[in-house]
Amino acid sequence: VDELRTKGVSAIMNEIETKLSDCDIIYVSFDVDSMDPDLTSHGTGTPVKNGLRPEEANEILTVLAKNKKTVCIEFVEVNPCLDEKANTMAEITLGLIETVLNEYK
């Protein structure tokens, strides 16, 4: 996350897309544990302090969803039973899913 914040999401995603350019297909498994629980919630198994901000996750997933080689994007580790903020993690994840569906062509 430090490198992402230093270089910026756009620069990091350019690097990632370059590394993925030789792949035939891209399968993304987005673990919501990667998002900062102070900005989202603890509605996941292993919250990561100082993780991704929701807007960073949104930008990352938008780039991946637009990539013609992306065949699947899954979202894992949402656990409403652990959410102290009334399903906030599920709602944030739903927003990310909506972004992906709007961008995926």
Q: Where do the model's predicted regions map?
A:
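Catalytic cores of soluble, metal-dependent hydrolases
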Residues: 1-105
